[in-house]
């Protein structure tokens, strides 16, 4: 009896797992737990017969003095735990690295030659392994590794090829390479100390470096590849399930085994390419226009994340359609076209856009905005907030420097404006969270959450205005209430001419004070949201309010005339928000 093998876990594998678990804990969802338990179960069940064979046939040996003595199927308890901890660690690393990834945009109907090439590679490895095992001798251990691992890899490659090759390398190569290199180092220490060993005559005798047998290097590379490919296959299936509701009606929570099988056999010809391209466009817009929302979106999951991105894409498209029009009259015409679009969409009340609605959009709206409008989930969103959003756009068009028209006269006017352009969006986000949650939320709590969301939206808009005083002045707009300017002995023209200085800073801080007042009043309702939305919404809110905190500090980081939050600070804010 000995503790040497156990010390390998205590020194190397468990601490690594504890760190990864601590990092990912705030992001862990029920779906993540399901994937983790499923992968660990498959890893343990599939490895036990193989490892038991190695030990019984003395291909792989352990000196009696290095293990505690507890065994199952001749496998030491420490070795069984290795199956668990390796899968746990590699899975968590993959989840951390892939959390920001929006998987639906990597779905594709195309099947390139790479799929066949990969299948040939893994099939050839299986054949080579079979020949090596049947021949015995020095290729025995390598052959056993290949005939055990490569059939699984062949299957996973066949069902998830497009994801494996299309996902960013940080989702594929990196979560394989990092734990593999780490375990190569750990294995080198163990082999040198004799904690375990490969029997001579069953190995090639080739080393990757001094102390690391080539068979061990291949084993850890293939096992980590198996784990990552398995997780990619899970994400591939979930992306299919979430992206195509016409094939998979509304689902909540962990999908059933039957549903997963149905996603596997769905022909790629039935993928809705228009929907995929619409999501690609929406994500590109999100990355470009709002880093705060993009960071927060990664903490949502499934159809909720898809619909939030679709909602944001519509809001950005509508804003650009109005703001980028060549004249005020064209902007007003764009608003009327958007009203007509909403009237038609809600009049028909269909989950998918009708031919009539498509024809209207394609004939009236510039092509670059088609996807954003047609993918708005109007079927389960209320119409009033969207109508109010357009009223906010109407207010923007009332600004006229030449005639001296500045529509924000009082604090109440600013509250109304903030409610229309930001409170409405927060309200719609909460409606989506409540729609997609599997939890039953009492109606009184729903009303409270929606109302508080409106107030929080106003708070965020105050931050936005405080940040953009100079930017707005450049387009002849002053959102500071005229009553505030009068108290400060300023006119809108003064702000446009000189949007900086002590007086402007005092007004900026007044905006921020009101923003944080509303924020403090509304933030308690976040805790009443369903678990799927609580943490992510807090991240979205705190990420944006951090801009306000930066503005309150001296020497904010500026980019294109705006205060920005440094990347590492944004990450710390998100981490803190998720841990509340």
Swiss-Prot record:
<comment type="function">
    <text>Bifunctional enzyme; part of the car gene cluster that mediates the biosynthesis of neurosporaxanthin, a carboxylic apocarotenoid acting as an essential protective pigments and leading to orange pigmentation. CarAR catalyzes the first step of the pathway by converting geranylgeranyl diphosphate to phytoene, as well as the later cyclization step that transforms the carB product lycopene into gamma-carotene. CarAR also converts part of gamma-carotene into beta-carotene. Neurosporaxanthin is synthesized from geranyl-geranyl pyrophosphate (GGPP) through several enzymatic activities.</text>
</comment>
<dbReference type="InterPro" id="IPR033904">
    <property type="entry name" value="Trans_IPPS_HH"/>
</dbReference>
<keyword id="KW-0125">Carotenoid biosynthesis</keyword>
<dbReference type="InterPro" id="IPR017825">
    <property type="entry name" value="Lycopene_cyclase_dom"/>
</dbReference>
<protein>
    <recommendedName>
        <fullName>Bifunctional lycopene cyclase/phytoene synthase</fullName>
        <ecNumber>5.5.1.19</ecNumber>
        <ecNumber>2.5.1.32</ecNumber>
    </recommendedName>
</protein>
<keyword id="KW-0511">Multifunctional enzyme</keyword>
<feature type="transmembrane region" description="Helical">
    <location>
        <begin position="65"/>
        <end position="85"/>
    </location>
</feature>
<comment type="similarity">
    <text>In the N-terminal section; belongs to the lycopene beta-cyclase family.</text>
</comment>
<keyword id="KW-0413">Isomerase</keyword>
<comment type="pathway">
    <text>Carotenoid biosynthesis; beta-carotene biosynthesis.</text>
</comment>
<dbReference type="GO" id="GO:0016117">
    <property type="term" value="P:carotenoid biosynthetic process"/>
</dbReference>
<keyword id="KW-0812">Transmembrane</keyword>
<keyword id="KW-1133">Transmembrane helix</keyword>
<feature type="glycosylation site" description="N-linked (GlcNAc...) asparagine">
    <location>
        <position position="89"/>
    </location>
</feature>
<feature type="transmembrane region" description="Helical">
    <location>
        <begin position="116"/>
        <end position="136"/>
    </location>
</feature>
<dbReference type="Pfam" id="PF00494">
    <property type="entry name" value="SQS_PSY"/>
</dbReference>
<feature type="transmembrane region" description="Helical">
    <location>
        <begin position="214"/>
        <end position="234"/>
    </location>
</feature>
<dbReference type="GO" id="GO:0004311">
    <property type="term" value="F:geranylgeranyl diphosphate synthase activity"/>
</dbReference>
<dbReference type="GO" id="GO:0045436">
    <property type="term" value="F:lycopene beta cyclase activity"/>
</dbReference>
<feature type="transmembrane region" description="Helical">
    <location>
        <begin position="139"/>
        <end position="159"/>
    </location>
</feature>
<keyword id="KW-0808">Transferase</keyword>
<dbReference type="GO" id="GO:0016872">
    <property type="term" value="F:intramolecular lyase activity"/>
</dbReference>
<comment type="similarity">
    <text>In the C-terminal section; belongs to the phytoene/squalene synthase family.</text>
</comment>
<dbReference type="GO" id="GO:0016020">
    <property type="term" value="C:membrane"/>
</dbReference>
<feature type="transmembrane region" description="Helical">
    <location>
        <begin position="3"/>
        <end position="23"/>
    </location>
</feature>
<keyword id="KW-0472">Membrane</keyword>
<feature type="transmembrane region" description="Helical">
    <location>
        <begin position="171"/>
        <end position="191"/>
    </location>
</feature>
<dbReference type="InterPro" id="IPR044843">
    <property type="entry name" value="Trans_IPPS_bact-type"/>
</dbReference>
<feature type="transmembrane region" description="Helical">
    <location>
        <begin position="35"/>
        <end position="55"/>
    </location>
</feature>
<dbReference type="InterPro" id="IPR019845">
    <property type="entry name" value="Squalene/phytoene_synthase_CS"/>
</dbReference>
<dbReference type="InterPro" id="IPR002060">
    <property type="entry name" value="Squ/phyt_synthse"/>
</dbReference>
<comment type="pathway">
    <text>Carotenoid biosynthesis; phytoene biosynthesis; all-trans-phytoene from geranylgeranyl diphosphate: step 1/1.</text>
</comment>
<dbReference type="InterPro" id="IPR008949">
    <property type="entry name" value="Isoprenoid_synthase_dom_sf"/>
</dbReference>
<dbReference type="GO" id="GO:0051996">
    <property type="term" value="F:squalene synthase [NAD(P)H] activity"/>
</dbReference>
<keyword id="KW-0325">Glycoprotein</keyword>
